[in-house]
Swiss-Prot record:
Gene: ung
EC number: 3.2.2.27
GO cellular component term of the entry, any: cytoplasm
SUPFAM superfamilies xrefs: Uracil-DNA glycosylase-like (SSF52141)
Compartments, as annotated in UniProt: Cytoplasm
GO biological process, one term: base-excision repair, AP site formation via deaminated base removal
Active site location: 64
Protein family membership: Belongs to the uracil-DNA glycosylase (UDG) superfamily. UNG family.
Protein's recorded name: Uracil-DNA glycosylase
Originating species: Yersinia pseudotuberculosis serotype O:1b (strain IP 31758)
Amino acid sequence: MSPSLTWHDVIGQEKEQPYFKDTLAYVAAERRAGKTIYPPQKDIFNAFRLTELDQVKVVILGQDPYHGPNQAHGLSFSVLPGVPAPPSLGNIYKELVTDIPGFQRPNHGFLQSWAEQGVLLLNTVLTVEAGKAHSHANLGWETFTDKVIVALNEHREGVIFMLWGSHAQKKGRIINTERHYILKAPHPSPLSAHRGFLGCKHFSQANQLLQQQNQQPIDWQPKLPAVE
């Protein structure tokens, strides 16, 4: 793959498609009507801003954004600094403590340092109405994020997809397992984590796969940005 290929090159044309324009128009109309929509407009596409196409090493697929105040900021499972880690992220940390030597559970849930190392934290739906989980399902976001997975599938090799839960695993059916790696487990939600997410060792497995490809492993210890 040419390192010059960007998200803009491979999915930029989606912005011109009617389904995409309709999705953005719906979200804009909901905001104008006074509804609170998460994440803020400026953060919707943060995953792509922070992890460029040629930098992607790992994909962690989420469902839709957190729907509480100050949580969602465009990265799956991550919350803004100063907000307690939600239960699913708490279970991700619990798994990291047992899987990665020296991992210490952080006192925050801000995963931007993962994104900056090549972990694409992608939700399948990119907006949600406050307090209403899955309220923006089937608007058109799923079509867009399918195109993202197709682009990764076609233009990259050796990407590690972590697919947690049936929703992510269905979404991942299009991934070519001869070119990429798929790690599957139940969702880290408290409802299902004990069924095999805890103990899945996906984080150490991902680093082993990266090292086998002569790539830098991920430092899974989330770092807060230095205060200016």
